[in-house]
From Swiss-Prot:
CDD domains: Ribosomal_L29_HIP. SUPFAM superfamilies: Ribosomal protein L29 (L29p) (SSF46561). Pfam families: Ribosomal_L29. Belongs to the universal ribosomal protein uL29 family. GO terms for molecular function: structural constituent of ribosome. Coiled coil: none annotated. It comes from the Bacteria. This is Large ribosomal subunit protein uL29. It comes from Finegoldia magna (strain ATCC 29328 / DSM 20472 / WAL 2508).
Amino acid sequence: MKTKEIRNLSDQDLQKQLEQSKSELFNLRFQLATGQLENPMMIGLVKKDIARIKTIIRERELNIGKEA
């Protein structure tokens, strides 16, 4: 997910997306442990998405990037 797409989401949608991404990461790690994961690169991509979402949530908490 692109940063611009994430910024366009509402706070509630961000929380939902964060939970979905965490769930997806859990499933990917489980697949990796059982040897069923075909593309290990997906783990890194999902982790980066989670980091982007958390960054945007924190920016909104601190009101960074908001034009007054």
